[in-house]
């Protein structure tokens, strides 16, 4: 099993994937996030955040208040399973997390917590 995925983000407020499948034989899983657009992070920054689907809206709302210096995430938010930092044009960041944090049958989503982005920039994370 390949225990990693490359995800690209764009100036059009999009990720290049809508679903990420994680093989349950993976002990850890790595997400490599890139930004192929031309806009800086304060204008069109993106991050990759993993949480239960039910927690996404609350994380995004609290993240807006936290601001860009905190990567639009409330510091120490226990609902966040994994996240990258906010990146802009030409930048990249990676995050590796323990697959044991995920439960089969639970609904997980990945999204960007930059204000207003999670309506379009989201997808499913499936453990199988």
Curated annotation (Swiss-Prot):
PANTHER family: AURACYANIN-B, OUTER MEMBRANE PROTEIN H.8. It comes from the Bacteria. It is found in: Periplasm. Coiled coil: none annotated. Disulfide bonds join 3-26. CDD domains: Azurin (cd13922). Keywords: Copper, Disulfide bond, Electron transport, Metal-binding, Periplasm, Transport. One of its GO terms (cellular component) is periplasmic space. It holds the Pfam family Copper-bind. GO terms for molecular function: copper ion binding; electron transfer activity. This is Azurin. The keyword Disulfide bond applies. Cu cation binds at residues 46, 112, 117, 121. Residues 1-128 form the Plastocyanin-like domain. Transfers electrons from cytochrome c551 to cytochrome oxidase.
């Amino acid at each position: 099993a390949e225990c990693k995925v490359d995800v690209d983000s764009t100036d059009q407020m999009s990720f290049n994937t809508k679903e990420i499948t994680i093989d349950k034989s993976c002990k850890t899983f790595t997400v490599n996030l890139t930004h192929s657009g031309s806009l800086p992070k304060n204008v069109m920054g993106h991050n990759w955040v993993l949480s239960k689907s039910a927690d996404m809206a609350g994380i995004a709302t609290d993240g807006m208040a936290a601001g860009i210096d905190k990567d639009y995430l409330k510091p120490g938010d226990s609902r966040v399973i994994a996240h990258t930092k906010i990146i802009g044009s030409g930048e990249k960041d990676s995050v590796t997390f323990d697959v044991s944090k995920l439960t089969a049958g639970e609904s997980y989503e990945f999204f960007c917590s930059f204000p207003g982005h999670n309506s379009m920039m989201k997808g499913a994370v499936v453990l199988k």
